[in-house]
UniProtKB/Swiss-Prot annotation:
Pathway where it operates: Purine metabolism; AMP biosynthesis via salvage pathway; AMP from adenine: step 1/1
Enzyme category, top tier: transferase
GO cellular component terms listed in the entry, alphabetical order: cytoplasm
Subcellular location: Cytoplasm
HAMAP family (alphabetical): Aden_phosphoribosyltr
Record's protein name: Adenine phosphoribosyltransferase
Keyword annotations from UniProtKB, A to Z: Cytoplasm, Glycosyltransferase, Purine salvage, Transferase
Catalysed reactions, semicolon-separated: AMP + diphosphate = 5-phospho-alpha-D-ribose 1-diphosphate + adenine
Self-association and partners: Homodimer.
Organism listed in the record: Mycoplasma capricolum subsp. capricolum (strain California kid / ATCC 27343 / NCTC 10154)
Known role: Catalyzes a salvage reaction resulting in the formation of AMP, that is energically less costly than de novo synthesis.
MF terms (GO), sorted A to Z: adenine binding; adenine phosphoribosyltransferase activity; AMP binding
Swiss-Prot/TrEMBL GO biological process terms: adenine salvage; AMP salvage; purine ribonucleoside salvage
Amino acid sequence: MNLKEFVVDVKDFPQKGIIFKDITPLLNNKDAFKYMIDTIAEFVKQLDVDVIVAPEARGFLLASAVAYATNKRFVLVRKPNKLPREVYDVEYSLEYGTNHQQIHKEDLKPNDKVVVIDDVLATGGTMQAIIDLVKLSKAEVVGMSFLIDLTFLHKEDLFSEYQVQKLIKY
């Protein structure tokens, strides 16, 4: 199945000059959604991981379904002040400024093998922050899966030290 057929380009969203990749038509098609989740789940099973980690918000949509399909733990990565208990915090750079990602300190166990799932790989800033959070937790990222790879925003070999799945490339 060609998942690209279920992604709609929205010009000038969320701001002028941006072409937003809208995945809601994919989520709204039961066959496409099932195919996407099954494909990511098969990748996760091959990695033999302990836990799935994902950032908000759309990463949660994919990763929670994959965690269910693979019977794996699911750990949230969130922006500041969204997690109620003690957290690890990593600052990372955005195009104009910085942001933070956080994870509960006790959610990952030392030596946990982790796969990170997110909807879009753009510059890699969010993913690098998540890798840093996993390392602070003394766990190990072994792979990552992206629904969409915006190849024009990063180097071709970005994250080549990991097993990486990319379902749609632009």
